[in-house]
């Protein structure tokens, strides 16, 4: 008490931890290297509609999917979301709400600096806070007179935020400082040979796009615009024609239901293979990966695992299979290596693949059983198989086996499935599959 009056006080929770990035772009949480299996998140287009009754079920589902980090990009959420992440132990990568093209004049820099200082003051004591970005994508392409955001605005914002938080990493913007987006078949060509990509340590957007279920689609596209698609209407609600038919090369099909299924199947396979591809590069050099997005922010054609009404896209089940702490997967030895595309091998060749065993746990797991088999989908004949026991080393990504299957004339035109499983006693740690086709 001071002169009979109680002093002003502020109560807040805080956490003491250390999250640092080394020179190779790897993350260390309390001196332990951590592989970040992340998720981009936006609760709603209108933040006022969101609250704990929405966030908590979302985050509990994420934790069951083994997601350990969230990236809030291009906006801020209400304080309660960050408090919930504090309690649940979800690591937060917060991006200042700047995206694409803004002015780089002195007035803009001054006002943005005040705002980023406020953002830092609001969030820096949250236990969940791990890292910052001052801008989502500061370098805009296809503009004849683009502003100098990266070399002028971003550096001022970084220095301003560092006055509030001198400890955590402050990142200048995507496509810089070891940070990149890959959206195969959505924002980039689905025929990209990913072996030619230079992959940095932090992939803060990966994913694809598909059309939500018919029940959801009917809530925002008028019935008379549904089929055949009225493309102007569909593009207004998020379907980009060139991305769908030129990048993803999705087939329209003979009905609206077929079109929806074709887009959802492509997204599911593309995202699954993007995850496998990035996890096979664990610490070589990939250290973090964030799917774009958890859910659609409004009724739209989007990139979420869930649509606006939290109805799952097909990709939801596919992602659950490959975001597990332990992962077994096959990497076909094929060139060019295209994610989301059917893998074609020819008669007279051998189907060859590396079998990966990935363990994100901090403990080794001894005496696990790894099994794989290749089955002819046309005849159900098992073409080859193997099983053996091994120790999964802590926090590792290894190739303990290879598949080599000569392809004879009898397999011409056949589709084959590769089934893989890692188990410990009666517990299945990872179960996965992939497909390839044999052509003449």
What are these regions (language model features)?
Residues 132, 162, 192-386, 390-396:
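Substrate-binding clefts and catalytic carboxylate motifs of secreted carbohydrate-active enzymes
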Residues 2-4, 71, 116-232, 285:
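Active-site region of glycoside hydrolase catalytic domains
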């Amino acid at each position: 008490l001071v002169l009979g009056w109680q002093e002003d006080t502020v109560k807040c929770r805080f956490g003491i931890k250390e999250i640092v990035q080394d020179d190779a772009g790897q993350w260390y949480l309390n001196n332990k290297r951590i592989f970040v299996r992340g998720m981009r998140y936006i609760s709603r287009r209108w933040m006022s509609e969101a609250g704990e009754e929405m966030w908590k079920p979302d985050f509990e589902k994420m934790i069951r999917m083994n997601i350990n980090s969230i990236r809030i990009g291009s906006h801020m959420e209400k304080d309660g979301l960050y408090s919930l992440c504090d309690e649940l132990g979800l690591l937060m990568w917060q991006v200042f709400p700047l995206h694409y093209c803004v002015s780089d004049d002195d007035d803009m820099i001054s006002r943005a600096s005040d705002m980023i200082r406020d953002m830092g003051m609001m969030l820096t004591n949250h236990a969940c806070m791990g890292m910052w970005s001052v801008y989502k994508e500061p370098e805009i392409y296809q503009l004849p007179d683009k502003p100098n955001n990266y070399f002028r605005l971003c550096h001022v914002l970084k220095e301003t935020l560092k006055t509030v938080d001198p400890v955590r990493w402050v990142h200048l913007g995507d496509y810089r400082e070891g940070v990149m987006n890959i959206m195969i078949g959505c924002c980039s060509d689905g025929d990209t040979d990913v072996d030619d990509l230079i992959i940095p340590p932090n992939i803060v957007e990966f994913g694809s796009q598909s059309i939500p279920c018919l029940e959801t689609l009917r809530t925002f596209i008028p019935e008379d615009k549904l089929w055949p698609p009225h493309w102007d209407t569909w593009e207004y609600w998020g379907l980009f024609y060139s991305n769908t038919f030129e990048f993803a090369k999705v087939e329209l099909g003979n009905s609206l239901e077929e079109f929806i299924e074709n887009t959802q199947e492509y997204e599911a396979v593309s995202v699954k293979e993007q995850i496998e591809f990035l996890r096979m590069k664990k610490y070589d050099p990939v250290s973090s990966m964030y799917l774009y997005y958890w859910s659609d922010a409004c009724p739209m054609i989007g990139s979420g695992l869930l649509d606006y009404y939290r109805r799952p896209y097909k990709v939801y089940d596919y992602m659950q299979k490959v975001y597990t702490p332990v992962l077994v997967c096959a990497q076909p030895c094929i060139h060019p290596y295209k994610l989301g595309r059917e893998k074609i091998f020819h008669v007279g060749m051998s189907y060859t693949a590396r079998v990966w065993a990935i363990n994100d746990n901090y403990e080794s797991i001894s005496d696990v059983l790894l099994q794989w088999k290749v089955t002819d989908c046309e005849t159900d004949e098992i073409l080859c198989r193997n099983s053996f026991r091994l120790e999964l080393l802590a926090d590792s990504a290894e190739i303990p086996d290879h598949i080599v299957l000569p392809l004879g004339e009898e397999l011409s035109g056949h589709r084959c499935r590769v089934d893989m499983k890692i188990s410990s006693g009666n517990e299945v740690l990872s179960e996965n599959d992939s497909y390839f086709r044999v052509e003449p």
